[in-house]
Amino acid sequence: MMPRALAAGGMGAVAVCVVLIGALHVLPPSSEVDPVRRTISQYALLEHATVFNVAVLVLAAGSVATMLALIATGLMPARSGAAVALALWALGLAAVVHFPKHNWAVGPSAHGTAHRVAGVVAFLSLPVAALLVARAWRRHPRWGGHAAATVTLGLLSLVCFAPIVVGVAIEPFTGVRWWRAIPLGAVERALALAEVATVVCLAWWSARAAAVERSPARG
């Protein structure tokens, strides 16, 4: 498949994901979920769980398409830390669906722990991938602007993740469980928006690179 089509697929997948998750926020009964306190994964426990699962898997597939587009255009080596991090992001998303959210009030569970670990891996892997991809191009005359935008979104994602780290760090001192110490739903939604924007940024960058490759030489 041509890199431009792969990049378009990546951006299209993000659009589908945003529409589906957005619908869960406004259509009953999932609209009753508190977006400030409850995580996005809460939708997987409701009757419209399939919508949530499809949205996340579509995003994972679009992320893989974006990764392939980055490789095909030469923006990212296939054998690189950035490629590994992007693959971990996509695998983490798939694992979030495979291991559904657990109600920790009834006690621990293996699949609940797997869900939580998969979420952390995914949320951290994408900004790392973005920073690694951009690092090689930050001084490039053509792609420096794209690299700067990618770095900005990668750093924004890490900033959005920071409240979770703070909540975990202060738990031993406050005695308040970390997910109650912060508005976890709002934090996760801000993080999710930053990360889907990062995927779009990477896909758009690879689409522009593919367009340059296809343009006739000027002499």
Which stretches of residues belong to each language-model region?
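Perimembrane loop-to-helix junctions flanking transmembrane segments
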Residues: 33-48, 180
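Interfacial helix-start motif at the membrane-water boundary
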Residues: 42-61
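Interfacial segments of alpha-helical transmembrane regions
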Residues: 3-12, 75-88, 142-156
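Interfacial helix-loop-helix junctions of multi-pass membrane proteins
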Residues: 27-32, 99-116, 168-189
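Membrane-proximal helix-loop-helix units in multi-pass membrane proteins
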Residues: 93-143
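Alpha-helical transmembrane segments of multi-pass membrane proteins
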Residues: 15-33
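Terminal transmembrane helical module of multi-pass membrane proteins
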Residues: 135-219
